[in-house]
Each structure stands twice: as C-alpha cells, then as structure tokens.
From Swiss-Prot:
Cited InterPro entries: Fmt (IPR005794), Formyl_trans_C (IPR005793), Formyl_trans_C_sf (IPR037022), Formyl_transf_N (IPR002376), Formyl_transf_N_sf (IPR036477), Formyl_transferase-like_C_sf (IPR011034), GART_AS (IPR001555), Met-tRNA-FMT_C (IPR044135)
Entry EC number(s): 2.1.2.9
Cited Gene3D superfamilies: Formyl transferase, C-terminal domain, Formyl transferase, N-terminal domain
CC per GO annotation: cytosol
Highest taxon listed in the record's lineage: Bacteria
Keywords: Protein biosynthesis, Transferase
Protein's name according to its UniProt entry: Methionyl-tRNA formyltransferase
Source species: Bacillus thuringiensis subsp. konkukian (strain 97-27)
EC class: transferase
Family note: Belongs to the Fmt family.
Keyword tRNA-binding: no
C-alpha cells in the first residue's frame, strides 16, 4: 500500500485529505499549521485539517517552521512514498521535497502559471476571469513553480463569490487528485514545464487592498466586492465610519457624478457612482461595530443623502 503524508491547513484542504483516505491510500501522517487563537476571546483552535485527521486517528505534526531541521526530520522519519500538499501555508524545504519515491505534489487553485501564490481564488474573481481551475504539479522550493502534471478548468459564474468558488475548487481538487495519483504511480504522466512568460501572482490580500477604489469601473468594483466575499470583505467609508460592503449590484448610471458619490437611494440599497457609466448599488453591508445587514435594514436607521461621498477619511 502506498504510504502518503498529507500537508494542508484550511477548509480547502479537507476534501483533498478525505479523498486520499477514501481512495485507500495509507495516510501515515498529516502536517498542518499550529493551533491559533481565534475570535475575540482568542480561543486556541485547531486547523480544519487537524480536526479531519483526528477523526481518522491519523498522527498530526504541527511545526511552527517546517524548514527547521528538527521539524522536517519528523516528516522524513515517516518514510512516505508520496507527499501531497494543498494550501499548507509554509514553504517546504528541499530535504522533504526530494525524499519520497513518487515525489511531492501540490493541489493549487488556479490554472498555473497564472495566479501563483496564496490567494488565487480571490484574484480570479477580482480580475474578472470567466474561468479558473485546479493544477496538480510537482513541488519545488520556488513558489508554485513546479512542473505541471494535470489540470482541470472550472467556470466562474457571473455572481460567483470567493466563498462559492472556494467550495467548487476544493471539490474539483479532490476529484482531480483522485485521477492523478494512480497515473503518477504508474509513470503515465509527462510533466510540463511552466511558461515563465505567462506567470502572474496572487499574493495574500493586504489590508490596503480591501478598500474599494470608486474611481475604477463599475465592473471592477463589483468584482472587487465579490472577490473579497466572505473574507476579508471589501470596505469603504460613509460619514467617516468604516463600512464593510458584502454585496452590490451593477446598475447603469445616467447622470455624471464624481466617483464614490451616492447618486440614488432606493428601497433595497443606494447607488454609488464609479469611474464609468456603470454604478454599483450596495445592497448588503456591515457598519463598524455592528452585524451584517441588508441595505434596506440599514436605511431604516440611517439616511445618507444623495451627493454624499464614500471612501473619504479611511
């Protein structure tokens, strides 16, 4: 039986681990990030992958830094035939990558060489792509740069969010891995080098990227809101207060107004001018210190005026 070590951390990784178990591989160990404090009460919380591994009585390693010798030697001591990673969250050292008989392969949520990095799902939507996918490739120490083994495309729907696409890609990754591993073991795959001229990056989202730039087109603002839903959530300011924007709709704007200005107030939301003739009607938001709510609910208690400028003093 093929001995596999799985390395992964978030919810995205869980279906991949589950599929390895269902397909009958001997998952002899799981490597995941350390437990972290979560929420306002800072409750020490295990990763989703750790929770899944413990359901199956699989030993779990949680290195703070996998590149340290005493940590990676614990992985090597398991003597895996194959290592599979999916959103592990740390750069894996060569000592591990070169050890398994069948190598170390990664399940990545984009069509490489596009969108290398830690936030490919967010960027696929924020950039307005109509499709993305899963790539399974050999791991190298350079970020997501290994030779490609298999790929599958996944359509991005008009109202897709990062949350819904995350779920689709997670399942697609598990399914593709199930088809890839047997072919890899049988030596039936021809690895393909990535074209470095086509490389783009999707680095982890920074706080300053979350703010809505109303000078962009309505389409770009709409994609920005979708791409940051449900985390970390796009934001703007209204009357000097931070407001998270959970959802909006593209609407035509007939009169010209400065980008970021409220040009219409309707029962279910207010329309904001952008950098072109497509406005964005905010329909779901979250004022600072309050719960997420519909814009109609918000408007019952707060009455912004037409001409109010959003995005100032953030």
């Amino acid at each position: 039986m093929i001995k596999v070590v799985f390395m992964g951390t978030p919810d995205f990784s869980v279906p991949v681990l589950r599929r390895l178990i269902e397909d009958g591989y001997d998952v002899i160990g799981v490597v995941t990030q350390p437990d972290r404090p979560v929420g306002r009460k800072k409750v020490l919380t295990p990763t989703p992958v750790k929770v899944e591994a413990e359901k199956h009585d699989i030993p779990v390693l949680q290195p703070l830094r996998i590149r340290e010798k005493d940590e990676y030697e614990k992985v090597l001591a398991l003597e895996p035939d194959l290592i599979v990673t999916a959103a592990f969250g740390q750069i894996v050292p060569n000592e591990i990558l070169e050890a398994p008989k069948y190598g170390c392969i990664n399940v990545h949520a984009s069509l490489l060489p596009e969108l290398r990095g830690g936030a490919p799902i967010h960027y696929a939507i924020m950039e307005g792509k109509e499709k993305t996918g899963i790539t399974i490739m050999y791991m190298v120490e350079k970020l997501d740069a290994g030779d490609i083994l298999t790929q599958v495309e996944v359509e991005i729907e008009e109202r897709e969010t990062t949350g819904s696409l995350f779920d689709k890609l997670s399942e697609a990754g598990a399914h593709l891995l199930s088809k890839t591993v047997p072919l890899l073991i049988q030596g039936k795959l021809e690895p393909i080098k990535q074209n470095e001229e086509e490389v783009t990056f999707a680095y982890n989202i920074k706080r300053e990227q979350e703010k809505i730039d109303w000078t962009k087109t309505g389409e770009e603002v709409y994609n920005h809101i979708r791409g940051l839903n449900p985390w970390p959530v796009a934001y703007t300011t209204l009357a000097g207060q931070v407001v998270k924007v959970w959802w909006g709709e593209k609407v035509p704007v007939t009169k010209s107004a400065e980008a970021g200005t409220i040009v219409a107030i309707e029962e279910d939301g207010f329309v904001v001018a952008t950098g072109n003739e497509t406005g964005v009607k905010i329909t779901e938001l979250q004022p600072s210190g309050k719960k997420r709510m519909s814009c109609s609910q918000f408007l019952r208690g707060t009455k912004p005026e037409i001409g109010t400028k959003l995005g100032e003093n953030a």
